[in-house]
């Protein structure tokens, strides 16, 4: 809801107030404790996957290189929001500077965009490995996989420059309270002193094209993969392929299910509380679940993690490669 015209000439805002989760002090402390534990577990889970891939030579393959990149991304994805949210639980003001808000906006959504590209790259890797096994070693070399990973990072951090720039140029001169725990484009545009239909349309088109194009690419890849797997005569071969692809599909379902509800469905018009819960799910809970999904459904990753935990015990430290 735009502010009245008579307030349009007020001083521009220098900071925003993130309402977060308004509740009693006791509940705030409880939430702080819960999210602090979730954050630490997320860091530990994704770091374990990175270390397992790094220290096991037999995991230096395109699939696991992409997975290690994905885990590294998840660490920074959750770090872009949770530490600030934890600080706000213990703060009385819950303020964030104007520039700090847009920096968080840029990094959070850039990493979310990068995640869609990595999920697409991982789906393409599985398609080549299962549907084109004879061509896979020549097409998906380690060097090419590294270039694909670098492309995901560069494209992910380039795509959101335009939306961030357009929204940052809107005049903010009235209310500065954001009913959210992060700087989300929807609540930000609602605080603008003037209507900005062009910016809203551009952002909506951008979100829809990005989400649906990558989602269709991923689903098309896995549709072909499933068709190929069903033709495998060996039950053991089918089980191994489904175990690997099943973990990828579970991650895709968690992430895309929540962002579609958030950005390409009527949920955007629902109360702020629902938007917070959905955002919380894809920004905090999915990075926590992903290491569990990959480690529980992938035999090679389970073995690598077991080996990692074994050598980390006191008195048994040695190089994992030995």
Predicted feature descriptions by range:
Residues 1-322:
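Transmembrane helical core of 7TM receptor-like proteins
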């Amino acid at each position: 809801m735009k502010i009245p015209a008579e307030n349009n000439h007020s001083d521009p805002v220098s900071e925003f107030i993130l309402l977060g989760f308004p509740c009693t002090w006791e509940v705030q402390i409880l939430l702080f404790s819960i999210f602090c534990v979730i954050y630490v577990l997320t860091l530990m889970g994704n770091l374990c996957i990175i270390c397992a891939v790094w220290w096991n030579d037999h995991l230096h393959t395109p699939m696991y290189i992409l997975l290690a990149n994905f885990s590294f991304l998840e660490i920074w994805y959750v770090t872009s929001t949770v530490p600030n949210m934890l600080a706000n639980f213990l703060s009385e003001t819950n303020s964030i500077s104007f520039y700090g808000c847009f920096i968080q906006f840029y990094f959070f959504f850039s990493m979310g965009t990068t995640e869609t590209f990595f999920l697409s790259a991982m789906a393409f890797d599985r398609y080549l490995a299962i549907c084109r096994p004879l061509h896979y070693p020549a097409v998906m070399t380690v060097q090419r996989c590294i270039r694909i990973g670098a492309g995901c990072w560069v494209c992910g951090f380039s795509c959101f420059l335009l939306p961030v720039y357009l929204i940052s140029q809107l005049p903010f001169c009235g209310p500065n309270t954001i009913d959210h725990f992060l700087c989300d484009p929807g609540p930000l545009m609602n605080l603008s002193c003037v209507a900005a239909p062009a910016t809203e349309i551009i952002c909506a088109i951008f979100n829809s094209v990005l989400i649906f194009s990558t989602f269709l690419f991923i689903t098309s890849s896995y549709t072909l993969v499933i068709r190929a797997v069903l033709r495998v005569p060996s039950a053991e071969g089918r089980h191994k392929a489904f175990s690997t692809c099943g973990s990828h599909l579970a991650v895709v379902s968690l992430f895309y299910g929540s962002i579609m509800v958030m950005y390409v469905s009527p949920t955007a018009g629902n109360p702020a509380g629902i938007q917070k819960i959905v955002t919380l799910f894809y920004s905090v809970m999915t990075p926590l679940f992903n290491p569990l999904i990959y480690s529980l459904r992938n035999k090679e990753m389970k073995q690598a993690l077991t080996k990692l935990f074994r050598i980390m015990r006191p008195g048994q430290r040695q190089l994992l490669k030995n």
